Amino acid sequence: YFENNSMKSFHQGIGWDKTQSEYQKELFPSKDGYVYKRYGYIDKTKLRYAGNFDIKPRGDYKKQRQFIKDEVCGYTPSEIAVAVGLSAVVNGRIQDIVHTPNLIVHFYGDSSRGKTTAAQLAVSVAGVPDIQRTSLFMSWNATSNAIIARLKMNHGMPVAMDEISKYNGNQMSAVVYALSDGRDRERLNKDATLRTTDKSDSFTTVIVSTGESTLIGKCNN
């Protein structure tokens, strides 16, 4: 027999819904665990996120606001980090209008200067800031294909990639271009026709990077 359960819907994308379907408009989790829709709230039991990132709300909202007030406001580097993280929401929205590339912000300098902490602060406005498989805070220790695959269908949530020296792949410049462009390189089908891409293959966000060397210097090498 069939158990009488309510129907549940899932979405893999996060941020601004690029498909503009009838049911999904804005897919941002709020502090109370609901997914926000343009004209109201969608009950979380009806719409669940099944994508790449751990974005489940944690902690206490009031304590987080107090932390921002006490520890961030008035200290310019921390204010910049939070502003960069929040700008992903704006960037994800305006790209279809002004067609700007993804913003890549690279924090560089000597070790133990707070680069990683600043990157964690930037992504903490949207999700878990610890390095783990489903976190918005990632490591450069990955292949270019894995990096691009992790970012797909993200249209408004900031991501961070820690320590650029850990990237051992080739063609660093090509990776940076792909991150800025918001999609992988164009490819051909078996019949030599250009493979079509859709919104599920793209991403529009802000990417925070860290390292002791500059991003341009790494590309030149």
Predicted features and spans:
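Conserved glycine-centered beta->alpha loop in an early N-terminal alpha/beta scaffold
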Residues: 1-76, 149-150, 154-157, 220
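Secondary-structure capping and boundary motifs in well-ordered enzyme cores
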Residues: 74-78, 110-114, 118, 149-156, ...
